[in-house]
């Protein structure tokens, strides 16, 4: 399985957290979440981080520079997973469940809070380009239905608990690990 993980440019990472984190802290937090997601995914295949940031380096992972929007990301041929970088609670079990879903479906969609899509897994030979931003999960369901693509939905805490807003930090502070939890706890009273 090949995985694509989009990652925002320096200065554009987690800007909605600016009311509780300065830019340096947001940068460290975003990088800590990215490293966590890459660490989990790398147990299942090759991971490629796609970013406009030409200075980004993630040890053991290919980094591709691209200015493409989320909806225009370069996607691999064959079977792939597209997973967001802001999932501090993502676990191997979450990814296993998503991959298991591909046994009976062409596409697996993983919803995030507020109706977003935090993971998309596509079976080899299936042409499906997801859409992102805002309430993208129902849009992706409709798109798949329109294309006649068989969809499985995997609901799990790891995919659901993305971090976009200050109130999302509590999950990372209480349930996260390592640097992600440490940074979240420095901002949220627990």
Swiss-Prot record:
The record's section on InterPro entries has: CofC, Nucleotide-diphossugar_trans
Q: A Pfam family in this protein?
A: CofC
* Gene Ontology MF terms: GTP binding; phospholactate guanylyltransferase activity
Catalytically driven reaction(s) = (2S)-2-phospholactate + GTP + H(+) = (2S)-lactyl-2-diphospho-5'-guanosine + diphosphate
E.C. number(s) listed in UniProt: 2.7.7.68
Gene Ontology annotations of biological process type: F420-0 metabolic process
Specify the superkingdom: Archaea
Which keywords belong to this entry? GTP-binding, Nucleotide-binding, Nucleotidyltransferase, Transferase
* Pathway linked to the protein: Cofactor biosynthesis; coenzyme F420 biosynthesis
Any idea what job this protein has? Guanylyltransferase that catalyzes the activation of (2S)-2-phospholactate (2-PL) as (2S)-lactyl-2-diphospho-5'-guanosine, via the condensation of 2-PL with GTP. It is involved in the biosynthesis of coenzyme F420, a hydride carrier cofactor.
Q: How does it assemble?
A: Homodimer.
| Family, per entry | Belongs to the CofC family.
Q: What is this protein called?
A: 2-phospho-L-lactate guanylyltransferase
The species is Methanopyrus kandleri (strain AV19 / DSM 6324 / JCM 9639 / NBRC 100938)
Question: Source taxonomy lineage?
Answer: Archaea, Methanobacteriati, Methanobacteriota, Methanomada group, Methanopyri
